[in-house]
């Protein structure tokens, strides 16, 4: 399992987490170009990404979603409240139908060889969540959590 922050802070957030077979992003709060550059440093590109999990709708977590959804068609997972919030951000432009996958806190999602578990957090947003990423492998279970913007 590999975890790599591409950006973190009030100017934008994006974290890569992956295994040999499965590659996901948590948030896309920077430009598509910056995400691609960050992935390139790890020998990856947006073509390798299987899914994007969004913690909440604030622009420092969603800035790249519009362009990525139109150019790359990567499935985006988040809660209903977060998706509704994202759809209200006009600067993201048109997001294609079928890109969003609604999830519920405390209900696991399987992507490739991993399980992603969303859980509720406290933040001033619509239905914000954090995520635990779990991989079962020959040498046991590996876990990592992505928790941003608490309070």
Per-range role (PLM):
Residues 1-42, 128-149:
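Conserved beta-strand hairpin/beta-sheet module of binuclear metal-dependent hydrolase folds
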Residues 4-14, 56-61, 116-118:
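Structured catalytic core of nucleotide-sugar glycosyltransferases
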Residues 7, 51, 100-104:
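Beta-strand->loop->alpha-helix junctions that form or flank phosphate-binding loops
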Residues 7, 16, 43, 66, ...:
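Short secondary-structure boundary/capping segments
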Residues 11, 31, 58, 82, ...:
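A generic "binding-loop/recognition-motif" signal
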Residues 32-78:
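Active-site metal-binding motif and surrounding structural segment of the metallo-beta-lactamase
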Residues 53, 117, 146:
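Conserved Rossmann-like nucleotide-binding pocket used by diverse enzymes
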Residues 80-141:
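Metallo-beta-lactamase
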């Amino acid at each position: 399992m590999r975890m790599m922050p591409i950006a973190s802070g009030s100017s934008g957030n994006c974290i890569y987490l992956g295994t040999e077979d499965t590659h996901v992003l948590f948030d896309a709060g920077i430009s598509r170009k910056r995400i691609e550059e960050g992935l390139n440093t790890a020998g990856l590109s947006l073509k390798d990404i299987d899914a994007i999990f969004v913690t909440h709708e604030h622009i420092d977590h969603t800035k790249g979603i519009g362009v990525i959804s139109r150019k790359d068609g990567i499935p985006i997972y988040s809660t209903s409240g977060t998706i509704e919030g994202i759809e209200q951000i006009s600067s993201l432009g048109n997001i294609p139908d079928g890109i969003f996958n609604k999830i519920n806190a405390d209900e696991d999602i399987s992507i490739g060889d991993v399980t992603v578990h969303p859980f509720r957090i406290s933040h001033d947003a619509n239905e914000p969540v954090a995520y635990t990423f779990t991989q079962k492998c020959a040498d046991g279970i590996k876990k990592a959590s992505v928790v941003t913007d608490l309070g």
